A protein has these predicted regions:
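Intrinsically disordered, low-complexity segments enriched in small/polar residues
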Residues: 27, 40, 44, 62, ...
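Short, positively charged, Gly/Tyr-enriched micro-motifs
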Residues: 77-141
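Short, flexible coil/linker segments at or flanking structured domains
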Residues: 1, 5, 9, 13-18, ...
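N-terminal juxtadomain amphipathic helix
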Residues: 46-93, 98
Length: 141
């Protein structure tokens, strides 16, 4: 793959995923899973599961404190816009660090989901615009 192709692919991925997601997280894998049930239109679809891990960069260090990597928090599931008739689930792993000055576990905070949901902020806004509220039905979850 040429550098230009890599650049175009990255630009495309930035348009597909939630805003700024690829700035802080890197794609580590994906898989497609078949869903045996049919949707309300009688079409069998699948689910695209995308794995992302936070880049190794603690964003809010306190001056004079030192931080040591300490693995990852449990992956969070975030529902995003369907892609090619497939439900999209983002499995997002955030890093954690130990503040060696205080001994506390710390991590970066991101607004990845709309409040009270497991939907990406943009997807929840779209659903709210379409339905007047965010529906609690399985075709979107």
């Amino acid at each position: 793959m040429t550098t230009r192709e890599n650049d175009l692919l990255l630009q495309f991925m930035e348009m597909v995923f939630p805003k700024d997601l690829l700035r802080y997280f890197e794609l580590t894998g994906f898989r497609e899973e078949a869903i045996s049930e049919k949707d309300r239109f009688g079409v069998e679809s699948g689910e695209l599961i995308v794995n992302l891990e936070e880049r190794d960069c603690f964003r809010n260090p306190i001056e004079g404190h030192t931080y040591r990597p300490n693995g990852f928090y449990e992956a969070s599931k975030v529902r995003d816009f369907p892609l090619r008739d497939k439900k999209m689930t983002l499995l997002i792993k955030r890093r954690r660090w130990i503040d060696e000055t205080t001994g506390k576990s710390v991590g970066n905070n991101y607004e990845l989901t709309a409040e009270g949901t497991r939907h990406s902020v943009e997807f929840a806004a779209f659903l709210k615009e379409c339905f007047g509220q965010i529906p609690d039905i399985s075709i979107f979850a």
